[in-house]
Amino acid sequence: KASAPPLPPSPIMMQRTGTFMHFEQLPDGSGISASYTAAPADGWTLTSVTPLDHALWTLDTENGYAAVPESIGKLYYADGSEQFNKVYQTYGNYSMAFAGAVKDGSAMLIDWTEPDTALNVHHSRIDSPYAGGSDQLSFSLSMTQRSGAFQMRVLGKGGYVQIAKAYRAAASARGLVRTFAQKAQENPGVTKLYGAATAKPDTMIRSRGSAGYTSHTFAELSQVAQHWNDVLGFDRALMTLGGWIRMGFDNQYPDILPASPEAGGNEGLAALSTQVRDYGWLFGLHDNYQDMYDDAPSFDTKYLMYNKDGRPQTGGVWAGGTPYLMASDKAMEFAYRNLPQVKDLFSPNSYFIDTTFNVPLAVSYAPNVLSRSGDMHWKQTLAGYAQDTFGVFGSEGGVEWAVPYGDYFEGILSKKTQAEPGSHIVPLMELVYGDCVALYPHMSEKIGTNGYN
């Protein structure tokens, strides 16, 4: 304790403003739960609260590293050559809401629940003879809500495997763990994913304003499927068609029906679906409920997401041009319209909705106000509806909030070799949710019909 001359009364102190922290021990005694409430003074707006600042630090001389679920998982080493400050937005470029630190073979875990949370991973040089090392890794946690919470757990001896196992228990308590065994009780068809060969052929390809071309007709894909069954002897497979929709791949969403006339129309697609399912395989179709093209018959600005300045949000540049982005709550109108019709026409037993598990959770402003938490809720609603309608459901990317509602993540394995100097890819997603969801590479890396032999 130290004494000092009393300060004059502060208007801020008198209004009881500030950030108030509360700590309590976790029930199992493994660590602490920390929560805060922020009360900014009148006329002030809360930007962020940083309850952890350069915390859980570890040194190069302590064999230190950080375990972070960037995509499938990554380790950063304290003795890495590069200095950096990496910012991870929860469920943006970050697949699970935790981070781990290891020091001399002893591990700690921090985890949280709010998507409006950002983790900073710092790697800095220390220029001091008293520091005990020359390089330091540390974490900072920033939150933007007026209240928030996180947990810190001491795990004892261990590394990233023990960190993932400890987080599995926390994820289970949040209701995020839904295993294949549990899913199979409601839909036995999910077991057809086990060991299945996966293929995603395109059919109709069209750039905006062009006539386009048919890369494979439904009849040609019927011959491919027959070859896989009769000659190669596939006992299980997942065939998902891209470009089957009315105007071809990535064109005029959300107006997908009828099936591409150039590829064989509704009749040809229905026949292919029946054939593939009769082999005992999974047959799926590629769809999208994020992008809305302004040349689509259903286009209307009332469905769009908006920036703070009132301009509609736009997506990337795809075959159909640059789409606008639909607000996830508004997009459900088209999912409720389209998916029952697709089920009645083609009876797929699997479905793929692009981008849903891949793009960061987004914020939309007036006139369509949507928070990150709201965006997550409606994307979970979309995935759950597709799963209930067709049985097996998958999407691009992979993130833990989707685990109860999705059966496979396409693309997360494509990140397995993308490690920069001073880091290493590790299977954190597989360790936490490996018995809940199948992990696949991106469609561009899958078997093609030209190489099926």
Regions found by a protein language model. Give the residues of each.
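Carbohydrate-recognition beta-sandwich/jelly-roll modules
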Residues: 1-238, 243, 261-263, 275, ...
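Residue-level detector of flexible, active-site-proximal loop/helix-junction positions
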Residues: 53, 290, 400
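Surface-exposed beta-strand edges and their flanking turn/coil or helix-capping segments
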Residues: 124-125, 167, 252-254, 298, ...
